[in-house]
Amino acid sequence: ADTIVAVELDTYPNTDIGDPSYPHIGIDIKSVRSKKTAKWNMQNGKVGTAHIIYNSVGKRLSAVVSYPNGDSATVSYDVDLDNVLPEWVRVGLSATTGLYKETNTILSWSFTSKLKSNSTHETNALHFMFNQFSKDQKDLILQGDATTGRDGNLELTRVSSNGSPQGSSVGRALFYAPVHIWESSAVVASFDATFTFLIKSSDSHPADGIAFFISNIDSSIPSGSTGRLLGLFPDAN
C-alpha cells in the first residue's frame, strides 16, 4: 500500500471511522483515522485558503484553513517525517464525493521545500506555483476524475457541463517532479504549501472533502476510495 501523510479538509463527518460529528480539518499519518482534528466552519460557496507548514527541527506538521471573513481553523501534530515517508516523495491534492456531493475546485496551489545540508551548507530547494490551471497542464499528473482548464481551475472531482457536482467521484493531481523531502545529512528539511479552494454544494450535507497529501512517488488512487477515504486510503483502518 502507499505511504500517505495528509492534511484533510473533511466536510462530512463519518463518525463510524472516528471522525468528530462536525466538519473538521485533520492530520492523517498512514490512515484516514486522523491523529488530530479541529472543528472547521466550512463556508459553502466561499473561497478558502489552506496553508500547511512542516519544519524538521520542531518536527511539527501544522495547517491553517481560513476564509476572507477571518474565520479560521488550526491543527498541528508532532511527527518525524523521516520515520514515516520515503526520502523521495510526490505532493498532491485529492478529493472525493460519495452519496452526497460538492465541487472540489482548486483555484491556486503553491509549494516550497528546502533541505539544508550539514556537510556542504547547500540548500536543495523545490518550488512551484500555479495561479491558474490550463487545459493541457503538462507539469501535473492527473488521476481519476481530476481535470484542468474549466475557468482556469483544477476540478478534483467530476462536475457536469453546467458545473454541478457529481456523486461517487474521486480525483487527484500530483506535481510531476519528485520532492527530496529528507536526507540523513540534512540539518533542516522544511516545506510549506498553500492552496485556495471552493467547495460548493446544494446538498444539505456536502461531501466528502479535499486533502493535501505527500506520498511515495508511484502512488495511485486505491480502488474503492471514493467518499470517506478521500482517494488516499484503501480502507478505514
Swiss-Prot record:
Residues that span the membrane, as ranges: none
SUPFAM superfamilies reported for this sequence: Concanavalin A-like lectins/glucanases (SSF49899)
PROSITE patterns: LECTIN_LEGUME_ALPHA, LECTIN_LEGUME_BETA
Residues reported to bind Ca(2+): 10, 12, 14, 19, 208
Listed InterPro entries: ConA-like_dom_sf, Lectin_LegA_CS, Lectin_legB_Mn/Ca_BS, Legume_lectin_dom, Leguminous_Lectin
Entry binding sites for a carbohydrate: 12, 14, 99-100, 228
Residues reported in the UniProt entry to bind Mn(2+): 8, 10, 19, 24
GO MF term set: D-mannose binding; metal ion binding
Pfam entry (one): Lectin_legB
Source organism superkingdom: Eukaryota
UniProt KW keywords: Calcium, Lectin, Manganese, Mannose-binding, Metal-binding
Further comment: Binds one manganese (or another transition metal) ion and one calcium ion. The metal ions are essential for the saccharide-binding and cell-agglutinating activities.
Function: D-mannose/D-glucose-binding lectin. Has anti-inflammatory activity in animal models when applied intravenously. Has antinociceptive activity in mice when applied intravenously.
UniProt record similarity statement: Belongs to the leguminous lectin family.
Subunit structure: Homodimer and homotetramer. Oligomerization is pH-dependent with homotetramers forming at pH 4 and above.
Protein name stated in the entry: Lectin alpha chain
Species of the source: Canavalia boliviana
